[in-house]
């Protein structure tokens, strides 16, 4: 773990020098991709997962892993590597649900379908889909067809109607249409009509794409 911690500290020092007096969430853009040491981080991360056991570390000791996963939110290489190590993935998901950084949570939520323990994956999904962060919850909803297809219609209706993320509601509704299409729900036609009534441009474009696919032979 020491090698990985050293690489994480190098990244932190670079970010502090490059963006003084700013915290990660306030910098904006794809600033993390400007770091030239990611290959060393990736190598140290994979080495740690291969050589060490998550149960040998406390939550505080593993906090740097969550931090660096969150910072790799553009390429998602660390999250993908983590998802290929099931025991580690479960441990870090538990930690992520208690963390304050949504950039780690959405990456893990979007990889739940790859878990070997489907019961555990569904438990995580129920937590992530109700996450207070809009994007985390939306990415979790998109996992629903693979893990809990029988819950898609209920959650699609909830996402469509809820107003806790009013400024992002259009995207919430696009996700609802997507999952209804994925499970071939008989409710899809009703929600396509609702999209037309809504009238917002991205939502209309999403509905049009779905309608186009439904008109193809064999659809």
Labelled PLM ranges:
Residues 168-219:
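Alpha-helical oligomerization segments
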Residues 79, 94, 108-110, 126, ...:
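Hydrophobic core positions within HEAT/HEAT-like alpha-solenoid repeats
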Residues 100-101, 132-134, 164-169, 199-201:
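Short inter-helical turns and helix N-cap capping residues of alpha-solenoid HEAT/ARM repeat scaffolds
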Residues 53-65, 85-98, 117-130, 149-163, ...:
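Amphipathic alpha-helical scaffolding segments comprising HEAT/armadillo-like alpha-solenoid repeats
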Residues 1-115, 119:
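Extended repeat-based scaffolds of very large eukaryotic assembly and lipid-transport proteins
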Residues 70, 82-86, 112-117, 144, ...:
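Alpha-solenoid repeat junctions
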Residues 131-149:
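Histidine/lysine/aspartate-rich catalytic loop segments that bind and position anionic ligands
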Residues 5, 75-76, 106-107, 137-139, ...:
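Alpha-solenoid HEAT/ARM repeat scaffold
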């Amino acid at each position: 773990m020491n090698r990985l911690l050293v690489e994480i500290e190098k990244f932190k020092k670079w970010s502090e020098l490059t963006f003084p007096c700013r915290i990660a969430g306030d910098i904006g853009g794809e600033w993390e991709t400007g770091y030239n040491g990611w290959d060393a981080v990736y190598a140290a991360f994979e080495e740690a997962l291969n050589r060490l056991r998550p149960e040998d570390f406390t939550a505080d000791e593993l906090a740097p892993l969550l931090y660096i996963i969150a910072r790799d939110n553009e390429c998602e290489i660390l999250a993908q590597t983590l998802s290929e190590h099931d025991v580690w993935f479960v441990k870090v998901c538990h930690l992520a649900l208690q963390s304050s950084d949504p950039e780690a949570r959405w990456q893990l939520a979007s990889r739940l379908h790859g878990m070997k323990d489907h019961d555990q994956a569904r438990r995580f999904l129920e937590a992530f889909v109700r996450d207070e962060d809009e994007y985390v919850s939306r990415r979790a909803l998109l996992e629903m067809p693979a893990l809990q297809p029988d819950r898609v219609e209920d959650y699609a209706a909830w996402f469509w109607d809820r107003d806790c993320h009013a400024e992002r509601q259009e995207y919430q509704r696009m996700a609802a249409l997507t999952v209804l299409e994925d499970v071939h729900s008989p409710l899809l036609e009703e929600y396509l009509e609702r999209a037309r009534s809504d009238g917002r441009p991205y939502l209309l474009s999403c509905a049009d794409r779905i309608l186009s696919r439904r008109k193809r032979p064999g659809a």
